[in-house]
Amino acid sequence: VGTNLVIVPRSAEFTGRDSDIVVGLEPGLAFGTGHHPTTLMCLEEIEDTVKSGCRFLDVGCGSGVLSIAALALGAEHAVGLDIDNDAVVSSKANLEVAGFSERSTVLQGSVPHKGIPDGDFDVVAANIAANVLIKLAGALLAAVSEGGVIITSGVLDTRLGDVVSAFESAGGVVQASRQIEDWTATRFVRAK
């Protein structure tokens, strides 16, 4: 995935390059193994945007793969948020096995959330359906600091214009976009 990120099943043996950042994952029931185009594009964007010491929020965290990748890339702390209890359990378990339970928090719910202070995150990722992204655009932008990055994915190319309009109306600026098959991912910056 990307330049240095490698996602492997936790039970698999893997020998890679010294520069590889290996993320071992047992996906369980929750979505997010790194192989679906939307997850793959999110991971590529995370590799491009996460800097050492940043604070990361994953809305719709599923298996926790995006948080694990962000932490492996140097994020200081990651918060996962999901409406599905199975995803919360899976994400917590994967973060613990990956050795990141001390640097992560997983909460049930969506944004806005009492445990998610406005402007507290440098990078926010949301790999969720277009209609949900449109509804949450303002809350996602509120969660990120001024000049911070929001990565959206889970959007079919036919809905990309609607998602971009919602984020631009809420104060987001498109920084980059990519597409695999019919799926898109877009990186927005919160206007200063």
Summary of predicted features, one role per range:
Residues L29, T33-V111, D120:
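Conserved SAM/SAH cofactor-binding pocket of Class I
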Residues A12, L43-E47, L141:
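Generic structural signal for well-ordered alpha-helical scaffold segments
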Residues S11, A191-K192:
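Short loop segments at secondary-structure junctions
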Residues V1-G32:
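Non-catalytic substrate-recognition/targeting regions of SAM-dependent transferases
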Residues T49, I83-A191:
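S-adenosylmethionine
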Residues V6, V22-E26, M41, D82, ...:
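Conserved beta-strand segments that form the floor/walls of ligand-binding pockets within enzyme
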Residues A12-V22, V50-S52, H113-D118:
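Short, glycine- and charge-enriched coil/turn segments that flank and shape catalytic ligand pockets
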